[in-house]
Amino acid sequence: MGHPDAITLHFPEFVRVAGEVLQGHIDLDLGAAGEDKIDEVHIKLRGSIVTRITEYENKPGEGTQTHYKTETLVRVDQVLWDQKNAPPNLPQVIQCPFQLPLPTGLPPSFHFSHHNRAVTISYAIEVVGHRHGILHANRRVRKVFPVVPPGDLAATAALSQGWRGPWRPYRVQDKIRHGIFGDHSEATMEFVVPELPTFPMGVGFPFALHIWTKTKPVHQEDLESKHGKLFPAPPESASEVEVKLKRRGRLHVYFQSEDIDENIQLRGSLGDSAALANIRTTFDQPTFTPLPDGHNKGVWNRGVHFEGFLTLPEAPTYSTKTVEWHYILEVKMDFPGLGNILKFEVPIHINSGVACPPLPQAPYQYNVPYTYPLPGGPPPMMNLPPSYWSGEHHNWDEVNGE
């Protein structure tokens, strides 16, 4: 990227909020800069939406056609140092502070890539050491960072203090049977979450997952210990319940559009087989309900309950003319037999859950460790793929010769 000692960028690494002022500084080694023929140092703030859709022709041999679109979200340039206008007798290493304003209304950082389509909403600051001479490439030090819009603070506070509000249940019930013939059994699944219009990213919210089963009519003496597992048996572990977070949406490039549809791996609770210890599991005592005129027959009622917290550190739900996405939590229980599946989808709206920091009230102090200006600390880190941080699918300035 450049001379290893000429330019050092100091910019705290955490999620930024649209509307805040970014602060940091560079250390510029004047001796190393002179050896590297650097005569000016600029800093750039960039944000953009870059989309790509590739069309595959139906007829053999016609090839493909790829459509690209870049939408600029923020573009700020500042000169940090100019050799011509620099005062004399400077120390070997100087500090150049900077302040870069993020506009309000920015969409959150986002990255999605499939074999024929991709979209990236990215933000970065870049320090450019301009070198005189047509054969000397400019030196660049870049740092990619994530951005979120301000979110709902009330939900964050309510969840952080322990949810005491109303709950919203999602419930499905069906008749099932183990074989092709015979009486049906019954299974019920219910998922309960706080009744909130939106959930803050990175803040755990409580859930309860209940599964109840009723056997087909059997004799009361048909106990599990004597006749094996009566059908349907509730799951013994949360790992038997399939829970997925799905991101769905659509991206547009001029007159072309494609779907966004991907599964996101959940961590730390439901949907993560390595986190079963974080889920509280309780079983109901089996009860027998006699059937009226059932000739000593009835049904066995059993149930299991899973309780814990879910955290969704994903890019907040958002919609622009270029791209939109939303989330669905899919919960599925597959009992033995053909088609014995209970499933429902829970729409989940995610917001950042954080406020925009206030404007700086004092000059930047490069010799003092940075302290986040809000008591809650910086926003939680988002789940973004390595390709976001590496700059893949970003339309950086040097591609255009800047």
Question: Where do the model's predicted regions map?
Answer:
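C-terminal beta-sandwich interaction modules and adjacent acidic
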Residues: 1-402
